[in-house]
Amino acid sequence: MDGVRSLPLFRRYFGDAFPSNSNLAIDLCKRGGVSKTSQLIHLGCGPGTVSSIVSSKFGCTISGIDSSPNLIGAALTEWKRESLNFECAPLNKTPLTDASATHLLTESRLSVDRNPSQILGETHRLLSDNGILMNSELVVTNSSLLDENVNRFLDTIFGQDEDRSMDGWVNLIEANGFDIIEAREERQIMKANRKKLGRAMVGFRLLQRTGGLSLSELGLGALEDDFNEVVNSTLTAMDDGLISYGSFISRRSRA
C-alpha cells in the first residue's frame, strides 16, 4: 500500500498528505510546541510538501525520511534547502543518530504498517529525553458495526485483529515508551477525505474498466472482484463516522 502514494494519479486526487492534510500537520506542530529552535524529524515525509510548509511556518530544521525513492527524489528536486534535508530509508531503520530530534511528526505511517511497534521503537530512539511525538492516524470507532467488505479492506491495510480505535492507538503508543499528552478525534479530516475518495472513485473505476488500473499492482488484488461494493461500503462507513481520524501528542519516556 505504501507505494500507492508515489503514483501521480493518487497525488492528483488526494494530495501529498492524504489521509492527513497540511493544516492538521501545522496544528499538531503548534500543539506540540515546535519552534525555530526545534530539530524536527518528519517520518514518512512523502514528496516533502508538508515538510516544506512546516519548515517555513516555524523556521525549524527538518530531516525528512521516506521509504519511497520516487517520493524522496521529488522532495530533493523541489524542496531541499539548508534547513530541510531528505533521505530515503525504511521508517523503522533510519540512518539518523540517537536522540537527534526534539520533535517527530508522522502522518498515518503507523496506520499502514503491519508492525507499527517497530516504527515507534525507532521514534523512541530518535527523540531526545522528553522529546515530543506528534502523529495522526486512521481510526475505526466501532469495528463491530462495519460491513464485512469494509473489514476485509481494513484487514488488508492494518492486518487482522488490530485495534485501531482511539483507545487502541493510545495503548499502542504508551506500550512503546511514550506518555500521552493529548489524543483528539479529527472527524473533519475524514469528512474531507470522504469527498476526495468519492471523486477519485469515478476516475479509478474508469481506469479499471479500460485496463489502466490494476488493483493487484496496488496490493489490493484480493478485492478485485468486489471493488465497487467495498468502495461503496467504505464511503458509507465514513459517512456514519465508523471510519474516522485521530491526532496524538505524546512525550518520550526516559529509557
Task: State each model region's role.
Residues 184-255:
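Conserved Class I S-adenosyl-L-methionine
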Residues 103-115:
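A short SAM/SAH-binding and catalytic strip from SAM-dependent methyltransferases
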Residues 92-104:
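A short acidic, Gly/Pro-enriched loop at the edge of an enzyme's catalytic core
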Residues 10-27:
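Conserved SAM-binding loop and adjacent beta-strand
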Residues 117-132:
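A short glycine-rich, Lys/Arg-flanked "PGG" loop and its adjoining helix->strand segment in the class I
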Residues 47-93:
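Class I SAM-dependent methyltransferase SAM/SAH-binding core
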Residues 162-176:
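Short alpha-helix
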Residues 138-160:
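Short, glycine-/aromatic-enriched active-site segment of Class I SAM-dependent methyltransferases
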